[in-house]
Amino acid sequence: ARDYVDKVISKELYDEVLTAQLSNGFVLKRIMPTYLKSDTESAGHATLLEWPNLDYVPKQVKRYVTSKKVRICVVQYQMRSLKSFKEFATQCEYFVDVASGYKSDFILFPEIFTLQLLSYLPNERPGIAVRTLADLTPKYLDLFNKLSIKHNINIIGGSHYTREDDDIYNIAYLFRRDGSIEKQYKIHITPNERKWWGVKPGDKIEVFDTDRGKINIQICYDIEFPELSRIATQKGAELIFVPFCTDERYGYLRVRYCAQARCIENGVYAAIAGNVGNLPFVENMDIQYAQSGIYTPSDFQFSRDAIAAECTPNIETVIIHDIDMELVKRHRFSGSTLNWKDRRSDLYEVVLKK
């Protein structure tokens, strides 16, 4: 019986019933022997056929994502005297090219690393110098926008002093690899920034959608205020980028310890990038100290000491590391402690007023 059916299927034999059924889309499921003993022509055999319903859509099997890797490159950047904007652009493209070569999804530059451009501009008092620097904003934006597209990478372009309505703001720009640009204003201004540059604060906490998840950017001093990270996490952020600029180790440790605390409090990752080296003849930028890094919550599924990767202190270098965005999602609801889930909203809350 099996041989007979196979020959009908291969068109070697013609069967009035079976050939017609197969030609109309019926599918042979199996042969049933001794199905009808009185059918002498078929020796009691029968075929079980299925005619598929073309309008039927089977229920899809749910597939759960178990891992979502994101590769981050953090630049620990050395401040240096420059002779032109082109020299600055060459140095920036070098780092972007390195990150792209290692297939990074994001590259993070430090806070106000564009202040090194003042080394070739006229030596003026700080209030005038920062406005001269702000005049280079279109060139800065054009440079990093082109680099993000050319090298297919999302760039957090450190931060840059920008003039809006004749006020100076410290702004971190996100350059997506699709060519779009977003910005986050520094919300808390340090005493030094007010004294030397007259910087004004922003008042919006942004969470940006990217092709690798939702991110938040907090510029240096901002990471020392836990309310910002709480609000950003409530808005969906899973990764916080912190460009910073500190002149000595005490200031650096404030940024670093607060970034690590924010990771534990909110179940997020944090990447921090700072400047190193000396910059003569630029007011308030004489010395720099940094040990840039990528930090995690503190639990079994994450890195030892909650440090995913870390630079050697105070030298120009990069670190490149993969983080798993699915881990932080699961950690918030199944970690050893549930800092996010166990908040006492009946006792306290963090409210964004604007």
Predicted features by range, described:
Residues 323-354:
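A short C-terminal boundary segment appended to hydrolase-like catalytic domains
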Residues 66-81:
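Generic N-terminal amphipathic, Lys/Arg-enriched alpha-helix
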Residues 134-156, 223-316:
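CN hydrolase (nitrilase-like) catalytic-core segments centered on the catalytic cysteine
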Residues 157-158, 171-174, 206, 272, ...:
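Short beta-strand scaffold segments in enzyme catalytic cores
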Residues 1-70:
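Terminal substrate-recognition subdomain of acyl/acetyltransferases
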